Structures are given as structure tokens and as C-alpha cells.
């Protein structure tokens, strides 16, 4: 077959295959056009998941008659000069969207330019353009797309259900609305109730309002403002506290010069910034806005313009990590503390508790110490100190003499310890309510931060064992541990081979005290087996520190004296990131006096 020039309609349909993948792609292109036209209000309507009908109405500048006639021709655009391809400042620039849509659907455009006496309308069907006719429209542009892919029916079978396609449209509009909080958006359709986002004032407060309207009130409560700048590149936005997480990274949004993009860059940078706060299977919610010179970013690397390429991707990644780490550190405990939400409070409502039993005596309850018992009997396997008469089995009212809160302690952020319950949780009184602390999770974070600080300064202090502890493990585990012996040694854990299937532990970190060496080594080996070989040394060392901290912290079941509980609270207040343990769980929750009064019907 000889080489021949393809007809314009076929060329446009080929281009449409790249630009118009699904109804959401049409909405994206048309809303971007509206934003580029200076619209202050945009209305989006869809029917049948967008395949039957899509309508976009805006109050932008509109088009003249001459511009409208050219707009549906391929590569006709008002947004790009001859030499501006590397300095793109608009969302659209190729001039492909309208001709591509018109080649696979029925397209109708009605527009009125501010200098025109009336509006003009133009229809395109299957790539065939009809003559322009006068029309009625007060301002801006209205674009309607119907029977999407009627000219390429094979594409229809690749579309999903109407509900799924409608949700994809919703996500596109949500992203564009987050990018432009100064523009009002309305989204409606046969598949959904109308949703509106009012325009807000520029600045951080307005941006947070728009993000909260879209991401929910929970995001507003936990949002931390972040910002970092260097060499003309600015990263700013809002990140959710570590207490607000998702099972996937779909709640992470990146915008570059006002353009919503998807980039693996953000996933790795966010993971690095939140590494000390979240478990590996949880992801934070955030929206980051990168602003830079258009020459520093290439937006022309993907047909749908959903990806960009930075001239200095390493700089952008470093700024994202720095902005997030700085914000999380600056917010400290506020970003980490978990509060009691309404659902939890509802569980306390009268009627949930079982009725009291007649003739019940707390002395016969399982928690009351039996004569002759001691701390070791109550919590086997844990080394205890002298309890100095501190009876954990007694009701909390009977220990108030030991834990009476001094006025100065109540005014501290975590208050004054009142008692310990279930040998696991510390209850502290604050000026505005109470705090419940998970003693193991809290102490785990403290030990972890001490290990990191020691590693960063003069190295972790070691404790030489008079008699090396021999730990028997399977040969594969032994080999794995010995391969990482140098990394373990940097944290004060010195091990040597002790024949087949065994290692000798000669030194342990002084911070760990009497931690079970065998259990520690087994856990370390399990975690090492999950490591990616490409994982940086720093991250591997932090994983080691986190595992060691877990084994070196106060366990649930350990009875604490009042002075020990208060000392733990004070150390938490002075330690960064103490609101989460190393696995991302909260170390304490707050219950305000207002919450307590609600429980008893006082409010």
C-alpha cells in the first residue's frame, strides 16, 4: 500500500485517542479552557457518566466570531506564541482539545466576547463543522458534548459504568477546584446531587477553606500549613496530621504552577517525610502547591498534560521533604495528638453501660491483689522495681494521695498524672480536661528519639555484657543478621557468629536496659527481610532504631509509681514527635471538659 496523507477527520480521531480517553478527559480539557479564559464561575453538568451529555458553562471572556471559527481547527490556539513552548503559563496550549472532541462526539459551542454585540454558536459533528449562527448568551462560553464516542463506537466498550465515570468526572473537578480556590465551581448531573464550592479570597486561609470543603472537616481540624523555598522554587500547602491517614496515596494532591498533576516524586518524598510518624501501610492526606519559573518545568511530556518534568527534580523533592518535616516538627504534639471524636463519645452515652451488680465488692474483683502476690505474679515476664506500696488493684480514688496534681503540673500540656489503669494507661488531669496516655507507645517514641539523637551526636552508648548472650536462630536468619552486623553495631548492638544457627550478643544499647535479646534479634531479622535493597542506609538505620525502641520501652503491664508517670509526661512534652509511637499509633488522646460534660448531659 502506498504512503498517503490521512484525511483531517482521521488525524483528529487519532489525536482524540490520546487526549480524550474517557468523559472525565473531556471535562478536564473544557474546564481548563474556562479557567484560561478568566472565568470566575464554572458550572459542570454530566448525564450518563458523561457519555450521553456534558455541559460546561463559564463567565469568562468568551471568543469573537473569528476566534470561534478557528478554535475547532487542529493546533489553533490563542495561548502559545512561537517560542513559548518551554515557558507555558496556561493550562491548555496545544489547540487539540476542541477538534479532538468534535471528531468523536457531537460538539456545540456558544460564546459571547465582551466586545461582540451578541453571542455566536457553532456545531461540530463527527469532525464536520457547521456554519456559525447568532445565539443568545449573556456572557462567557457554554460548551455541550453529546453522544461521546458515537463516531468511534469501539471506544465505548472500554468505558466503565455510569457511576464510575461520573466519579471520575467528580475527581477531575475536585482537583481543578483545589487548584483554583478563587473560582466558584458547581458540579451537577443525573447521577448526583449538585455540589457547589464558593469562591474564596486568595491566600492560605482561603486555600484551606477550599481544601476543607473538598477533603472534609476532618482535614481542616488536622491541617498543618507547610512551606519551603529555595532557588526560586516554592513548595507550600497543607498536610494532614499523622492522625489522619488513608490506606492508599489517593489523598495526596500535587499542583505545579496551578496545574493538577500526578507524579511519583510526591509519593517518595511524602513517605520520607512521614517515615517517623506512620506505619508503612498508611498514607497521609495533603495538598502541595509548587510554584516555579515556567522554564524550570516541562508540561509538554504527556498528551493529557497530567505529568510534568522538572529541570531539577532533586531540588523539588528536597523542598517537599523539608516543608513537611518542618511543619510536622513545628506543630509538635498538636499535630500528633488524637482527640475523642463524636462516634467515640456516643459510645459513652447513658444506656451503654450494664447495670451495676448487687453486692459487688471490688476486693473480690480479679484486679485486686491476692494476698502474697507481687508485681511479678501480676505481669509475668517483666522486670519490676519496688512498688513502694503503690497498689494497682485499688480503685483510683484510693491513690489520690499519691498522685494529687499540683497546680503547676495541671497547667502543663499533658497535665498531672492521677492514676494508672489496667497497668497500661496513664490518666492525667489538665486544666481543660484529661489525657489518657498509652505508656508503652509513649515510652517507645522517647527511646526512639534518644537513639536517633545519640546516633547523630557521639554514637549510641553501649553496655558490655559480662557473659555474652547466645541466641539460637535458623541459619538463614543468622546469615541475614551477620550481613547487617555493622549497621546493628552503629546502634550499640554487637553480635558475632557462634557456630551454625547461633549468634553471640556481646554488647547492647544502654538505653534498652534488660531487653530480651533473642526477641529483639528475631524482630530485627523479620524487618530486614522486608527491606528493599535500594533502601538508603539512613532509612535502614532508622528501622533498626525503631525496632530497638519497641523492645527497650516500658511494656503494658508494668506498674508505674506516680513520680514515674509524671516523669514520663514531662519527657513527652520535651520530646519531638511524641504524639505517635514508631508504628504510627497515637500515644495519647485528649478528652476536654466540654466532652466530659456532654457525657453527663450538662451540655
Curated annotation (Swiss-Prot):
Q: Which GO terms describe its molecular function?
A: ATP binding; ATP hydrolysis activity; ATP-dependent DNA damage sensor activity; mismatched DNA binding
Keywords in alphabetical order: DNA damage, DNA repair
* GO biological-process terms attached to the record: mismatch repair
Q: A single GO CC term, please?
A: mismatch repair complex
InterPro entries assigned: DNA_mismatch_repair_CS (IPR014762), DNA_mismatch_repair_MutL (IPR020667), DNA_mismatch_S5_2-like (IPR013507), HATPase_C_sf (IPR036890), MutL/Mlh/PMS (IPR002099), MutL/Mlh/Pms-like (IPR038973), MutL_C (IPR014790), MutL_C_dimsub (IPR042120)
Query: PANTHER family, per this entry?
Result: DNA MISMATCH REPAIR PROTEIN MLH, PMS, MUTL, DNA MISMATCH REPAIR PROTEIN MLH1
Homology family? Belongs to the DNA mismatch repair MutL/HexB family.
Q: What does this protein do?
A: This protein is involved in the repair of mismatches in DNA. It is required for dam-dependent methyl-directed DNA mismatch repair. May act as a 'molecular matchmaker', a protein that promotes the formation of a stable complex between two or more DNA-binding proteins in an ATP-dependent manner without itself being part of a final effector complex.
Query: Protein name, please?
Result: DNA mismatch repair protein MutL
Amino acid at each position: 500500500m502506498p504512503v498517503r496523507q490521512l484525511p483531517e477527520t482521521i488525524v483528529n480521531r487519532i489525536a482524540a485517542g490520546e487526549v480524550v480517553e474517557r468523559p472525565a478527559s473531556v471535562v478536564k480539557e473544557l474546564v481548563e479552557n474556562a479557567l484560561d479564559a478568566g472565568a470566575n464561575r464554572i458550572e459542570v453538568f454530566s448525564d450518563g457518566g458523561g457519555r450521553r451529555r456534558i455541559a460546561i458553562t463559564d463567565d469568562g471572556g468568551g471568543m469573537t466570531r473569528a476566534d470561534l471559527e478557528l478554535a475547532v481547527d487542529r493546533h489553533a490556539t490563542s495561548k502559545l506564541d512561537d517560542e513559548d513552548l518551554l515557558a507555558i503559563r496556561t493550562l491548555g496550549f496545544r489547540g487539540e482539545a476542541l477538534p479532538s472532541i468534535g471528531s468523536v462526539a457531537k460538539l456545540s459551542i456558544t460564546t459571547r466576547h465582551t466586545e461582540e454585540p451578541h453571542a455566536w454558536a457553532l456545531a461540530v459533528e463527527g469532525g464536520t463543522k457547521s456554519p456559525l449562527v447568532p445565539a443568545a448568551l449573556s456572557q462567557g462560553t457554554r460548551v455541550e458534548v453529546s453522544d461521546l464516542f458515537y463516531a468511534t463506537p469501539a471506544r465505548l466498550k472500554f468505558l466503565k459504568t455510569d457511576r464510575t465515570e461520573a466519579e471520575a468526572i467528580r475527581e477531575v473537578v475536585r482537583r481543578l477546584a483545589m487548584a483554583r480556590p478563587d473560582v466558584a465551581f458547581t458540579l451537577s448531573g443525573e447521577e448526583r446531587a449538585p455540589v457547589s464550592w464558593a469562591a474564596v479570597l486568595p491566600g492560605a486561609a482561603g486555600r484551606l477553606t477550599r481544601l476543607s470543603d473538598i477533603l472534609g472537616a476532618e482535614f481542616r481540624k488536622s491541617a498543618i500549613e507547610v512551606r519551603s523555598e529555595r532557588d526560586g522554587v516554592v513548595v507550600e500547602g497543607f498536610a494532614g496530621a499523622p492522625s489522619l491517614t488513608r490506606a492508599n496515596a489517593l489523598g495526596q494532591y500535587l499542583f505545579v504552577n496551578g496545574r493538577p498533576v500526578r507524579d511519583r516524586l510526591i509519593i517518595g518524598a511524602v513517605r520520607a517525610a512521614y517515615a517517623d510518624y506512620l506505619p508503612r501501610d498508611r498514607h497521609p492526606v495533603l495538598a502541595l502547591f509548587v510554584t516555579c519559573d515556567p522554564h524550570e518545568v516541562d508540561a509538554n511530556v504527556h498528551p493529557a498534560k497530567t505529568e510534568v518534568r522538572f529541570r531539577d527534580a532533586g531540588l523539588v523533592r528536597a523542598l517537599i521533604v523539608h516543608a513537611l518535616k518542618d511543619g510536622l516538627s513545628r506543630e509538635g504534639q498538636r499535630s500528633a495528638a488524637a482527640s475523642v471524636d463524636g462516634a467515640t463519645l456516643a459510645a459513652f452515652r447513658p444506656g451503654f453501660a450494664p447495670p451495676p451488680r448487687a453486692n459487688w465488692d471490688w476486693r473480690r474483683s480479679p484486679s485486686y491483689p491476692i494476698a502474697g502476690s507481687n508485681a511479678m505474679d501480676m505481669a509475668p515476664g517483666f522486670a519490676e522495681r519496688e512498688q513502694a506500696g503503690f497498689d494497682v488493684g485499688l480503685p483510683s480514688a484510693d491513690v489520690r494521695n499519691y498522685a494529687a496534681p499540683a497546680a503547676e503540673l495541671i497547667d502543663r500540656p499533658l497535665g498531672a498524672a492521677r492514676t494508672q489503669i489496667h497497668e497500661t494507661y496513664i490518666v492525667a488531669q489538665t486544666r481543660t480536661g484529661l489525657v489518657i496516655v498509652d505508656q508503652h507507645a509513649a515510652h517507645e517514641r522517647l527511646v526512639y528519639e534518644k537513639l536517633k539523637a545519640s546516633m547523630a551526636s557521639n554514637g549510641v552508648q553501649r553496655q558490655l555484657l559480662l557473659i555474652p548472650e547466645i541466641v539460637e536462630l535458623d541459619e538463614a536468619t543468622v546469615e541475614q543478621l551477620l550481613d547487617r552486623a555493622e549497621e546493628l553495631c552503629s546502634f550499640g548492638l554487637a553480635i558475632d557468629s557462634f557456630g551454625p544457627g547461633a549468634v553471640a550478643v556481646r554488647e547492647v544499647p544502654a538505653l534498652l536496659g534488660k531487653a530480651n535479646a533473642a526477641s529483639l534479634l528475631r524482630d530485627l531479622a523479620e524487618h530486614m527481610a522486608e527491606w528493599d535493597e535500594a533502601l538508603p542506609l539512613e532509612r535502614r538505620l532508622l528501622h533498626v532504631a525503631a525496632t530497638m525502641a519497641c523492645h527497650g520501652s516500658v511494656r503494658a503491664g508494668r506498674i508505674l509509681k506516680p513520680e514515674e508517670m509524671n516523669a514520663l509526661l514531662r519527657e513527652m512534652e520535651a520530646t519531638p514527635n511524641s504524639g505517635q509511637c514508631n508504628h504510627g499509633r497515637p500515644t495519647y488522646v485528649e478528652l476536654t471538659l466540654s466532652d466530659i460534660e456532654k457525657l453527663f448531659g450538662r451540655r
